[in-house]
Amino acid sequence: MNIDVGRQSNGQGHETVHAGFPADQSGLSADRIQMFCSDRGRNAQGDDTSGPGSAAIRANAPRAAVDRMIAAFTSFLAQEMGVAEDVVEFDGETFWAPGSNLTPTMLEAMEMARAQGRTDLQRHAARAGLPDSSLPDGANISEIVIDPEAGQTDQVRYTVVDDFGNLINLMSAEGQVNGGAAQGLEQTMLERVVFDAEGRLLTVSFLGCALPRASRVPMIGITTEPVPLAQNQLGMNGSGEAGAAGAPVAVANAVQDRGIRQVDMPFTPSRIWEVLRDVSEAAEQ
């Protein structure tokens, strides 16, 4: 089975998710499913990889295609089994019908059709749309310790509770949240664009950027509370930007809990120290 996806995979795990779902639905082994990402020679439609929608939206198309495959082979196999079409069932692994000893898998059904020259059963296409967008929800809690003498802010605990609806692959979803939260935490604490007095950009490479470091990111506690999305036949929500979107707000709220009412990101030690000094001086007046 070949699947053409109009979004490029940049580490999101599209290959695992998009192949895993039709494998479960069709009974085919995942290693028999090949995925092509943003190949304009095969698929003229597509868009950018952004927002939490690759699996939640695009997995509906393979589902529709698998449903069409099942319907097409049900009609074909009914004739082979000598039974009425409406008694043929597909249980996720094999086709079967009362009164027949034939129990072919999807792959075996394809081979039977090929042997009879039924090339019309070798290719199936379907379109699927959604009445509404992906609507993920969740909460992020940041617990920090601030050293007022140095302005150093340490992230000691970070907890996430997310509702992504039904999950195809829990490990992949948790990886999205972990990576996004790590990027969001470092963006909040250190990452910034720096210009000199003449307006020349100084942070021109990764050597000058504060990239996330494992030593600065605590173990992130992730809990999922799935509520199936009614607008999606699969009940799925997106998860792509949940970690990165929640982290800056959670950390900013934690910093403000120290009595700091206004400070711009990133919350560098020098910036936090200056604000705490101003707060202390204002309290003494």
Where are these regions (language model features)?
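Cofactor-binding beta-sheet edge motifs in enzyme active sites
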Residues: 1-285
